[in-house]
Amino acid sequence: MQKESQTYKIAPAERLASVSEYYFSKKLKEVAQMNAEGKDVISLGIGSPDMPPSKVTIETLCNNAHDPNGHGYQPYVGIPELRKGFAAWYQRWYGVELNPNTEIQPLIGSKEGILHVTLAFVNPGEQVLVPNPGYPTYTSLSKILGAEVISYDLKEEDGWMPDFEALEKMDLNRVKLMWTNYPNMPTGANATPELYERLVDFARRKNIVIVNDNPYSFILNEKPISILSVPGAKECCIEFNSMSKSHNMPGWRIGMLASNAEFVQWILKVKSNLDSGMFRAMQLAAATALEAEADWYEGNNHNYRGRRHLAGEIMKTLGCTYDENQVGMFLWGKIPASCKDVEELTEKVLHQARVFITPGFIFGSNGARFIRISLCCKDAKLAEALERIKKLS
């Protein structure tokens, strides 16, 4: 039989041209290769909590994993125990009343919620407002789904808060969603009741849905607050929360969103066509984790405070300045004027000191003169990173 000469060739979808591989996906491959070569890189890059969940959380998981009836498909809406757990948690810590049956949707991590919400609310060609600097996934997923991304500035001189005067002057006729993230990543800026009140007022007047991503409010933060605490916020806002950060469960992939019943149903319509319910034992364990007392959170924060001090010493050694009032699991610092380029600095630290620090440009142009240090690293490793950096020429 004659051989076919035609080469088999498949082209990727055109939508992939609008995005590149996630920065950390690429960079962590490089770090892994360096480690394979014996270079022992200390990673201060991603925010993946290294402390364990509570003991009772793990016990609940293990005990329920033995249940022979717990291994089947679970409800798309999440099991009642988890929905009630989230509702009680919001009432206790945020003072927000949520109907567990209609106003809460558990998620396989809040990151997937970005996809679900965008699919539920935004048509191709419509616009979304995304913070600069901000979480890169807000931008990349919006582009993949055909939305037009309009960035709004968060600036150091404004305390990394939205400039409402500038927003009022924008043409917002095609804007469907506005992404916000407080306590803020990467800047560590904290929310205030006044900020949330202004956002709710802005959403109502401009007919925009505010989506507030709120995973960091229990870390180095004395008073967690929710945008849903503003009267009427449920009518125009959606809030994400995540157990990855607050309960040291990043690998479990358990998060949630809360809003009004109609919005939640729209999102469920998308979600139920994309995935299924999480393993029952995990959901029961997550519900147990949500019952943690204040001293459990304080135990985490005691560790984070010590780590933040060491991260601050690293910042000072690099000549960076930072706001000591930051909250969350990162430290955000401004590079010195003598430094021409942030990536030049972080690459020098990576290849000469073997310490991986995140350059701020990956979060947007307003992060181009900043670096971010993760606090998700044991004290001894942070101290070693500091000593390595001190030896840089």
Please provide the spans of the model-predicted regions:
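Conserved PLP-anchoring active-site segment centered on the Schiff-base-forming lysine
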Residues: 120-142
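PLP-dependent enzyme catalytic core of the Aspartate aminotransferase-like
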Residues: 2, 150, 168, 348-358, ...
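Conserved glycine-rich beta-strand-loop-beta hairpin in the small C-terminal domain of fold type I
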Residues: 287, 303-312, 322-334, 367
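N-terminal small-domain helix-loop-helix segment of the aminotransferase-like
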Residues: 2-109, 116, 290-292, 393
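A short helix->loop->beta-strand "cap" motif at the edges of active sites that frequently abuts
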Residues: 126, 147, 205-209, 233-235
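Conserved core segment of the aminotransferase class I/II
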Residues: 4, 232-305, 309-315, 392-393
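Helix C-cap/helix->beta junction micro-motif
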Residues: 37, 145, 205-206, 318, ...
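Active-site phosphate-binding strand-loop segment of PLP-dependent enzymes
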Residues: 150, 154-225
